[in-house]
Amino acid sequence: MAKKVIRVIKLQIPAGKANPAPPVGPALGQAGVNIMGFCKEFNARTESEVGMIIPVEITVFEDRSFTFITKTPPAAVLLKKAAGIESGSGVPNKTKVATLKRDKVREIAELKRPDLNAASVEAAMRMVEGTARSMGIVIED
């Protein structure tokens, strides 16, 4: 018989840098999960992606065991890295902060596609372009 799920926790943690300090510790402590066990496993699994923020979905079972799934970094983080900027525009409709080529957007869309609800790469590209627009990044051909 399958184990009973008691909670699903969603967090965004820098790759390779999970530690028991907030926000990880309190979120997992409330669920009764072995915090250090999670941190070691997460850091080992994400050590190749250091510097990125990795969304993680932790499933906690009745016997306090857990499994977790790491997802691709948020589109906004990938766009900021590609454009070489620290943050998006405060007024994206007036102030543009960077320009990206459509090829770079395609790369990001292909990377994000498993986590996006998109039927094709073109649909995923439109989603990524929308995120870029809302950050004040101009997309050119």
Swiss-Prot record:
Pfam families: Ribosomal_L11 (PF00298), Ribosomal_L11_N (PF03946). One or more lysine residues are methylated. InterPro entries: Ribosomal_uL11, Ribosomal_uL11_bac-typ, Ribosomal_uL11_C, Ribosomal_uL11_C_sf, Ribosomal_uL11_CS, Ribosomal_uL11_N, Ribosomal_uL11_N_sf. SMART domains: RL11. It comes from the Bacteria. GO terms for molecular function: large ribosomal subunit rRNA binding; structural constituent of ribosome. GO terms for cellular component: cytosolic large ribosomal subunit. GO terms for biological process: translation. Keywords: Methylation, Ribonucleoprotein, Ribosomal protein, RNA-binding, rRNA-binding. Belongs to the universal ribosomal protein uL11 family. HAMAP family: Ribosomal_uL11. Part of the ribosomal stalk of the 50S ribosomal subunit. Interacts with L10 and the large rRNA to form the base of the stalk. L10 forms an elongated spine to which L12 dimers bind in a sequential fashion forming a multimeric L10(L12)X complex. Forms part of the ribosomal stalk which helps the ribosome interact with GTP-bound translation factors. This is Large ribosomal subunit protein uL11.
